Amino acid sequence: MELRTLGSTGLVVSRLGLGMAALGRPGYINLEHADDLARNYDKAEMEGKAYDVLNAAWDAGIRYFDAARSYGLGEKFLGNWLSLRAVSPESVTVGSKWGYTYTADWKIQAQAHEIKEHSLATLQRQWRESVGLLNGYLDLYQIHSATTESGVLENREVLRELARLKSEGIHIGVTSSGPEQGATLRKAIEIVIDGSRLFDAVQATWNLLEPSVGPALTEARAAGMGIIVKEALANGRLTNRNKEPGFGPKLAVLQTEAQELGTSIDALVLAACLSQPFADVVLSGATKV
């Protein structure tokens, strides 16, 4: 698989990355997620399935892995797998995120699956947790789903703590979601601490159903930031799992294009993301081999 440098960070990444969101917890928003897990939510079973996917990803050449504190046991599974496989830290790039706390207690129908808090105390606590769970495999630490409304991009205490981590060799990123992604990313591009741009990378939702953040990602790339694209398959809504009546005509177009190219709909949609000139890494949320 093609490797490249993530923006100006010097971190080497594969064009495809693997996200741990659907592998680390039993309840997730991907369509038919329960079926992918065969409705077996035993923690040991899920860890074993995560290892199967991680091994397949590694063997396919994937060298970027993305986790978060709110991904259930995702960081633990990833950290354990990296250690058991004795992966050299120089041969892999690992990113994680802070700002959400997992609260579902391994339940599928929990009242709340996560709580968002972008405070200094949360950053300091979750940083320690992430480093420990990932067994030291951590290169990029990202604000999880920053928005212009959350205030985290104006919180000087948080920004200075992130700058301190950066001074110790950790690359700093920000992720975004929702209709205001562009405004969030443009604000992040402008943040400078002690004469240096704070954020080294951005992670945003871009796919064929939601491409609106594209211009902002182009600006971030021009500024030297690494670009990670998430939700390329729109959590399954850009596959034949999407049974919404209004999606039928779009699915037919995708099926026709995929057939003409001799490929699958999944591969076609991922290729559309990979072809964007701003994209360094496109994340897959695979849950089975």
Regions found by a protein language model. Name each.
Residues M1-T93:
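N-terminal binding-site loop/beta-alpha segment at the start of enzyme catalytic domains
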Residues L6, L18, A57, F65, ...:
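Conserved, mostly hydrophobic/aromatic
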Residues L11-L16, A60-Y64, V87-V92, N135-D139, ...:
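Short, well-ordered coil/turn segments that N-cap beta-strands
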Residues G24-G48, I108-Q124, E149-S150, P179, ...:
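Active-site mouth loops of central-metabolism enzymes
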Residues Y41-A57, K116-L134, E180-V192, I265-V269:
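Short, acidic/polar
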Residues E47, S145-V289:
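Beta/alpha (TIM)-barrel catalytic core signal, keyed to glycine-rich beta->alpha loops juxtaposed to Asp/Glu
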Residues E90-T103:
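A short, structured active-site edge motif that brings together acidic residues
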Residues E129-G151:
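Active-site groove signature of glycoside hydrolases
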